[in-house]
Swiss-Prot record:
Signal peptide limits: none
Protein name: Homer protein homolog 2
Family, per entry: Belongs to the Homer family.
Pfam family, one: WH1
Transmembrane segments: none
GO molecular function, a single term: G protein-coupled glutamate receptor binding
Localisation: Cytoplasm; Cell membrane; Postsynaptic density; Synapse
Gene knockout outcome: Homozygous knockout mice exhibit early onset progressive hearing loss.
Originating gene: Homer2
Assembly and interaction partners: Forms coiled-coil structures coiled-coil structures that mediate homo- and heteromultimerization. Interacts with NFATC2; interaction is reduced by AKT activation. Interacts with NFATC1 and NFATC4. Interacts with DAGLA (via PPXXF motif); this interaction is required for the cell membrane localization of DAGLA.
Keywords noted in UniProt: Cell membrane, Cell projection, Coiled coil, Cytoplasm, Hearing, Membrane, Synapse
Entry superkingdom: Eukaryota
Matching InterPro entries: Homer (IPR045027), Homer_EVH1 (IPR044100), PH-like_dom_sf (IPR011993), WH1/EVH1_dom (IPR000697)
Length: 354
C-alpha cells in the first residue's frame, strides 16, 4: 500500500450480521479512522480501518462496487470478496457526502487501472506472438539462403530448431529476470509495508496500554465523582428537606403574624373601649339610681295595685250585694207592675160595664 492515505475520515464501523443478513453488528466501539489507500504492488485501491490492533476493514474497491446512502449520516457497500457488507455511521451529513464522492472517484480510478492492466496484458501477449512468428521466418530465410550457400546446405534441421529454442529461452529469461526484479520490488514494498504495519501495531499496542491506563484512571475518577455526586445528591436531599421545613416555618410565621395583627386590632379596639368605660360606669350608676327609683316607684305602685285590688274586691262584693238587692227589687217591682196591670184591667172592665 501507499505510504500516505488518499483520503481519511472518522466513522463508526458496522458489518452485516452473517446469520440474518439484516441486522447491523458494530465492528468498533467508537468512531475510528477510515482511509482510502492505493496499493502500488497490486495496482488497486483499498478502504482500510484499524481499531487498535484489529483490522476491521480491508476492502479492495472494484469497478462494480456501489456505495449507497441509506440515511443522512449512514452509508454502506458490499464486498463480494470478503462476503460481507460494510456500513459506516458518520457524525454529519457532510462527512458522508465527502466519503461517497471519494468512493466514486476511487472506483473510477480502479476501473481505469483495470483497463490499463488489460491493455498491457494484451500488448505483452501480442508482442510475444509476434516474436514467436519472427523466429521461424528468420529460420526459413536462413534455409533459403542455405540453398545458395554450400556451407549452409550442410546445417541440419536440428541445429535450426535448437537456435529457435535458444531465442525463445533468451526471451523467456529476459522476461523472467524482469519479473524477478518486479517481484523483488514488490517483496521489498511488502516488507516495508509489513515493517510499517508492525511499527503501527506496536504503536497501537503501546497506545492501547496507554489508553487502558488512562481508562483505569478515568474509571477511578468516575467512581470518585459518582461517590461525590451521591454525596451531593444526599446533601441536596437534606437541603430540599430543610427548604421544605423552612417553607413550612415561613407559612407558620405568616399565620402567626396574621394572628398577631388580628390580636393587635382587638387590643386596639379594647383600648378604645376602655377609654369610654368611665363614661359607661357613670351612665351605669345613673341608670342604677334611676332603676332604684323605678323599683321604689314600682313598689309603691304594687302597693297601690294591691290596695286597688282590695278595693276592687270590696267593690265587686258590694256590686254582687247590690245586684242581689236590685234583683229582689226588680222581682218586687215586677209583682207590683203585674198588680198594676191587673188593677188597670179591672178599671177598664168596670168602665166598660158602666
Amino acid at each position: 500500500m501507499g505510504e500516505q492515505p488518499i483520503f481519511t475520515t472518522r466513522a463508526h464501523v458496522f458489518q452485516i450480521d452473517p446469520s440474518t443478513k439484516k441486522n447491523w453488528v458494530p465492528a468498533s466501539k467508537q468512531a475510528v479512522t477510515v482511509s482510502y489507500f492505493y496499493d502500488v504492488t497490486r495496482n488497486s485501491y483499498r478502504i482500510i480501518s484499524v481499531d487498535g490492533a484489529k483490522v476491521i476493514i480491508n476492502s479492495t474497491i472494484t469497478p462494480n462496487m456501489t456505495f449507497t446512502k441509506t440515511s443522512q449520516k449512514f452509508g454502506q457497500w458490499a464486498d463480494s470478496r470478503a462476503n460481507t457488507v460494510f456500513g459506516l455511521g458518520f457524525s454529519s451529513e457532510l462527512q458522508l457526502t465527502k466519503f461517497a464522492e471519494k468512493f466514486q472517484e476511487v472506483r473510477e480510478a480502479a476501473r481505469l487501472a483495470r483497463d490499463k492492466s488489460q491493455e498491457k496484458t494484451e500488448t505483452s501477449s501480442n508482442h510475444s506472438q509476434e516474436s514467436g512468428c519472427e523466429t521461424p521466418s528468420s529460420t526459413q530465410a536462413s534455409s533459403v539462403n542455405g540453398t545458395d550457400d554450400e556451407k549452409a546446405s550442410h546445417a541440419s534441421p536440428a541445429d535450426t530448431h535448437l537456435k529457435s529454442e535458444n531465442d525463445k529461452l533468451k526471451i523467456a529469461l529476459t522476461q523472467s529476470a524482469a519479473n524477478v526484479k518486479k517481484w523483488e520490488m514488490e517483496l521489498q514494498t511488502l516488507r516495508e509495508s509489513n515493517a510499517r504495519l508492525t511499527t503501527a501495531l506496536q504503536e497501537s499496542a503501546a497506545s492501547v496500554e496507554q489508553w487502558k491506563r488512562q481508562f483505569s484512571i478515568c474509571r477511578d475518577e468516575n467512581d470518585r465523582l459518582r461517590s461525590k455526586i451521591e454525596e451531593l445528591e444526599e446533601q441536596c436531599s437534606e437541603i430540599n428537606r430543610e427548604k421544605e421545613k423552612n417553607t413550612q416555618l415561613k407559612r407558620r410565621i405568616e399565620e402567626l403574624e396574621s394572628e398577631v395583627r388580628d390580636k393587635e386590632m382587638e387590643l386596639k379596639d379594647l383600648r378604645k373601649q376602655s377609654e369610654i368605660i368611665p363614661q359607661l360606669m357613670s351612665e351605669c350608676e345613673y341608670v342604677s339610681e334611676k332603676l332604684e327609683a323605678a323599683e321604689r316607684d314600682n313598689q309603691n305602685l304594687e302597693d297601690k295595685v294591691r290596695s286597688l285590688k282590695t278595693d276592687i274586691e270590696e267593690s265587686k262584693y258590694r256590686q254582687r250585694h247590690l245586684k242581689g238587692e236590685l234583683k229582689s227589687f226588680l222581682e218586687v217591682l215586677d209583682g207590683k207592675i203585674d198588680d198594676l196591670h191587673d188593677f188597670r184591667r179591672g178599671l177598664s172592665k168596670l168602665g166598660t160595664d158602666n
